[in-house]
């Protein structure tokens, strides 16, 4: 945004002959203060703009503050300076001493309000007459930039694109079924090319009659029964089983790809027993007599499966059989083919079925440790309970830096400090007092440690302590210590601050005087 403001200010200066342009914007912390946002200037006005950087006009005070408060622009010329002389004298403590020096060579100064965005100040070494075109162009350019949305979608474009969409009636999709949408053009088959041609007619007939045994099995089994089929079985006497289907067999239904004979599967279980039986006997006699305990298949379903004819061993080609057998069948299982199958080491153990949403696999140790550390951080960092992990880490870094600064400044505050000002009767004042009985309401002192200042100010009410703190923070000062003290029936705000090298004691005093005058006028109006 800074480059956009500078580009607009530059175009205003070049198009209308202004020597400099300064954009004053409302401070986000204290809306009563205007802060320096961006500027453009020529070589002659470099010093003027540099002096404006550290100024902070207050709303309703001074020319810039009055323009921001009233919303009416001001157009000043050097030949009418005598009309404003008294006001400039009053504005000396308000931070506008720079305007007096401007008129030594500046002919025109224009201060234009921008509504809620702020104020723009223009100056020129030439006499530029007031123009409605300049006012409208300046206001429109800067307000559009301030109110421009960032990273927001264009809703009009979105609705236009939605309006171009064509709506299709639901009847046009009635010809599609679930299997038609997700079926492959050429699904893999376990049958050899010779058997595909010979079985095409019978397969089509079975498809017409609806005798798809693979889907009969899935429809007759419940979800719990399917889990039991996939789990390791107890003592059973299983023989081989192959179910005749139309281009689908039990392995296709369960997602096993016959084109990958080296697929690694669990060495023990129902399907390994079935495959070992079919490989050893070279026959595929269909039988579900010993598997019926796993499911609630009714008598008609079992009868249909029992009467289904078996194919020869060509269902599993010989070259694929050797590879598959070595991977799927262990030595101890080969010896148990055709007999009673038992598990010696897991005979009396029953597996518990996993509940919905739970996983049997244990969480990795490193992931568990990370989750534990994040939980501890959320309890330690303020406002870290409901934020994301990225925000939590950012808050953690800021909190650590803050705690480190507390330890650093705590040691410094324990050390005795002295003011750099000249002591007189054990008291130091930020400005001269005519007589000893007068108490100055504001004191700003520079301490013996570089960059540190002590600020003291009278508070009429306790709520003014927070306002003073906001003004101090608005000047870019870091508050190291802030307390309220009672002295002779008056409440004093006492601050020790860390200032940047470019901030002077006089500038801090100017801002506090403005705040003090604002409260004084407010009290006079109430009284």
Swiss-Prot record:
InterPro entries: bHLH_dom, LHW-like, MYC/MYB_N. Residues 343-368 have a biased composition (Basic and acidic residues). One of its GO terms (cellular component) is nucleus. It comes from the Eukaryota. A motif (Nuclear localization signal) lies at residues 341-348. Residues 295-318, 335-368 are annotated as: Disordered. Residues 354-403 form the bHLH domain. GO terms for biological process: cellular response to auxin stimulus; male meiotic nuclear division; meiotic cell cycle; metaxylem development; root development; seed development; xylem development. Transcription factor that may regulate root development. This is Transcription factor bHLH157.
């Amino acid at each position: 945004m800074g480059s956009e403001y500078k580009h607009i200010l530059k175009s205003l200066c070049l198009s209308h002959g202004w020597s400099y342009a300064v954009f004053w914007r409302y401070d986000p912390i204290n809306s009563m203060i205007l802060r320096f946002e961006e500027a453009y200037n020529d070589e002659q006005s470099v010093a003027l703009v540099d002096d404006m950087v550290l100024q902070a006009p207050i709303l309703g005070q001074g020319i810039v503050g009055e323009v921001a408060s009233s919303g009416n622009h001001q157009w000043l010329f050097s030949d009418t300076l005598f009309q404003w002389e008294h006001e400039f004298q009053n504005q000396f403590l308000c931070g506008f001493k720079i305007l007096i020096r401007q008129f030594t060579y500046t002919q025109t100064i224009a201060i234009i309000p921008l509504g809620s965005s702020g104020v723009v100040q223009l100056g020129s070494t030439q006499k530029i007459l007031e123009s409605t075109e300049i006012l409208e162009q300046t206001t429109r350019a800067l307000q559009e930039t301030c109110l421009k949305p960032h990273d927001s979608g264009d809703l009009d474009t979105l609705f236009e694109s939605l309006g171009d969409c064509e709506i299709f009636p639901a009847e046009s999709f009635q010809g599609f079924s679930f299997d038609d949408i997700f079926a492959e053009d050429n699904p893999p088959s376990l049958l050899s090319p010779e058997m595909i041609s010979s079985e095409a007619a019978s397969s089509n007939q079975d498809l017409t009659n609806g005798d798809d045994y693979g889907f009969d099995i899935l429809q007759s089994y419940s979800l719990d029964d399917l889990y039991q089929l996939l789990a390791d079985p107890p003592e059973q006497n299983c023989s081989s089983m192959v179910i005749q289907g139309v281009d689908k067999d039990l392995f296709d239904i369960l997602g096993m790809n016959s084109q990958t004979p080296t697929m690694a599967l669990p060495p023990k279980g129902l399907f390994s027993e079935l495959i070992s039986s079919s490989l050893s006997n070279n026959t595929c006699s269909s039988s579900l007599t010993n598997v019926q305990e796993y499911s609630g298949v009714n008598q008609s379903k079992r009868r249909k499966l029992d009467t289904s004819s078996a194919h020869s061993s060509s269902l599993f080609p010989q070259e694929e059989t050797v590879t598959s057998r070595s991977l799927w069948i262990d030595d101890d299982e080969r010896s148990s083919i055709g007999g009673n199958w038992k598990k010696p080491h897991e005979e009396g153990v029953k597996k518990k079925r996993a509940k919905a949403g739970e996983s049997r696999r244990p969480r990795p140790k490193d992931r568990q440790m990370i989750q534990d550390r994040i939980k501890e951080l959320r309890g330690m960092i303020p406002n870290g309970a409901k934020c994301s992990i990225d925000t939590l880490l950012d808050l953690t870094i800021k909190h650590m830096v803050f705690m480190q600064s507390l330890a650093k400044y705590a040691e410094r505050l324990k050390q005795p400090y002295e003011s750099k000002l000249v002591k007189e009767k054990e008291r130091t004042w930020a400005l001269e007092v005519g007589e000893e009985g007068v108490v100055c309401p504001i004191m700003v002192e520079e301490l013996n440690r570089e960059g540190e200042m002590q600020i003291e100010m009278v508070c009429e009410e306790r709520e003014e302590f927070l306002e003073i703190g906001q003004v101090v923070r608005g000047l870019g000062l870091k508050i190291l210590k802030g307390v309220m003290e009672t002295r002779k029936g008056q409440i004093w705000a006492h601050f020790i601050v860390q200032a940047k090298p470019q901030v002077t004691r006089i500038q801090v005093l100017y801002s506090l005087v403005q705040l003090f005058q604002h409260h004084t006028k407010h009290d006079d109006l109430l009284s």
